[in-house]
């Protein structure tokens, strides 16, 4: 009776152990198996010399070296080693015979795992690989209709891309017989970029209401209708051009600007290199030589003295020697940089941190003499460059009885502006001059009360 009871208990223990460990192994097996029918694979974008290849246990193809292009050398293995071709490689290597070796299981410290190195039989402790995405907090991606989530290679967070199953693409016909290509995260093929430097274009003649336009990824221009300009809600500043300059409205803009009055300018016709014809821009008065294509010019490098440096003049391709500047009285900015040949001050690599311009709203100023507004590196807003007012002849406007002359800052010529309302303003008791447009005098001296 006792023997039957002991035997029954033994059977129960064996059954329980088989049930527990069998269920655990089955769970692990279920977790390790992936149903490739539920996986959507991108086409392997292999380069020249590579072929698509599917690794064991994976659903999608990756790229590996085309073994038909590889000439392998068969090594001679020493005793205890045998020839084996690793998965994903083309050539055989010598691998140790591990069937006759008994290995112990190492006890690894925290942060280390047991792993068998390549070419070895027994496991050793190696540092556990760090997952760079473990500490990255990714946003929840809610893709719109027609887009699907995907994780780009080498990135931690999921992004949205177009669902190519809902997109119908037309195969483009590329110029010069080029083959269309497709990026991994795009649905449609497109033409590769063309080297436009080697393309000779025929310039079409456009109508009066058309203009030349070069489409993206194309080399040659086409004619397209001019866009209609709507200036209904545009508020333009009053343009007051100085003597020798006239107002004009640039094509495609709503507001007037100032340009030089070409009837007062005498120009000399330049003689250009290589027999090229001088050209004139629409808003300029004088002709100038077109830019030279220096890509086909070979230059002889001149040997300069110690007090000279190489310099390439504007519009020229080849450098010449010119004297170094006198840097005795030069005032240079405080920055870290390198000094170019022929310069006194360094080209700043690092500039001190300026103001936070994200909180500043600036209006673009309209400068006199047609000058372009400039912006200093440590400032947020554009401003007009300083004008030499000594060389400017200003017409003095006639102001009304309730107006006075006023010269705005950074301007040379005065304008009329309304006089201020001085009722109720208490002025200090002093000796001074009352300027036009002011309520109180500018005090030269203040009387002192005697005790």
Curated annotation (Swiss-Prot):
Signal peptide: 1-22
Major subcellular location class: secreted
Keyword annotations of the record: Glycoprotein, Secreted, Signal
Sites carrying sugar chains: 25, 45, 209, 326, 402
Subcellular location: Secreted
Organism superkingdom: Eukaryota
Record-level GO cellular component terms: extracellular region
PANTHER family (UniProt xref): TNFR-CYS DOMAIN-CONTAINING PROTEIN, TRANSMEMBRANE PROTEIN-RELATED
Protein name in the entry: Uncharacterized protein DDB_G0274171
Organism per entry: Dictyostelium discoideum
């Amino acid at each position: 009776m006792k023997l039957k009871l002991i035997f029954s208990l033994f059977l129960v223990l064996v059954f329980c152990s088989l049930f527990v460990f069998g269920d655990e192994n089955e769970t692990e097996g279920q977790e390790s198996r992936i149903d490739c029918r539920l996986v959507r694979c991108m086409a392997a974008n292999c380069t020249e010399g590579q072929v698509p290849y599917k690794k064991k246990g994976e659903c999608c193809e990756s790229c590996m070296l085309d073994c038909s292009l590889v000439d392998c050398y068969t090594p001679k293995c020493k005793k205890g080693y045998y020839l084996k071709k690793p998965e994903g490689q083309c050539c055989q290597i010598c691998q140790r015979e591990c069937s006759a070796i008994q290995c112990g299981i190492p006890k690894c410290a925290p942060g280390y795992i047991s792993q068998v190195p390549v070419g070895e039989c027994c496991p050793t402790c190696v540092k556990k690989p760090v997952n760079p995405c473990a500490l990255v907090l990714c946003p929840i991606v809610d893709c719109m209709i027609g887009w699907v989530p995907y994780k780009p290679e080498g990135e931690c967070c999921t992004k949205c891309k177009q669902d190519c199953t809902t997109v119908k693409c037309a195969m483009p016909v590329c110029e010069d017989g080029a083959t269309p290509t497709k990026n991994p995260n795009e649905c449609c093929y497109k033409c590769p970029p063309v080297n436009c430097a080697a393309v000779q274009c025929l310039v079409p003649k456009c109508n009066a209401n058309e203009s030349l336009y070069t489409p993206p990824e194309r080399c040659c221009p086409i004619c397209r209708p001019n866009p209609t300009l709507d200036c209904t809600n545009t508020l333009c500043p009053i343009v007051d051009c100085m003597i020798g300059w006239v107002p004009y409205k640039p094509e495609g803009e709503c507001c007037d600007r100032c340009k030089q009055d070409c009837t007062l300018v005498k120009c000399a016709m330049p003689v250009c290199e290589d027999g090229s014809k001088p050209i004139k821009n629409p808003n300029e008065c004088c002709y100038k030589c077109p830019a030279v294509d220096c890509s086909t010019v070979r230059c002889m490098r001149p040997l300069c003295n110690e007090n000279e440096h190489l310099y390439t003049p504007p519009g020229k391709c080849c450098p010449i020697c010119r004297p170094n500047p006198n840097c005795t009285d030069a005032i240079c900015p405080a920055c870290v940089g390198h000094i170019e040949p022929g310069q006194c001050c360094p080209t700043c690599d690092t500039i001190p941190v300026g103001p936070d311009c994200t909180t500043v709203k600036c209006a673009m100023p309209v400068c006199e003499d047609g000058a372009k507004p400039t912006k200093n590196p440590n400032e947020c807003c554009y401003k007009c460059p300083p004008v030499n007012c000594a060389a400017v002849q200003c017409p003095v406007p006639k102001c009304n009885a309730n107006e006075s002359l006023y010269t705005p800052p950074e301007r040379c010529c005065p304008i009329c502006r309304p006089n201020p309302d001085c009722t109720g303003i208490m002025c200090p008791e002093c000796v001074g001059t009352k300027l036009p447009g002011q309520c109180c005098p500018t005090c030269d001296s203040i009387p002192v009360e005697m005790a």
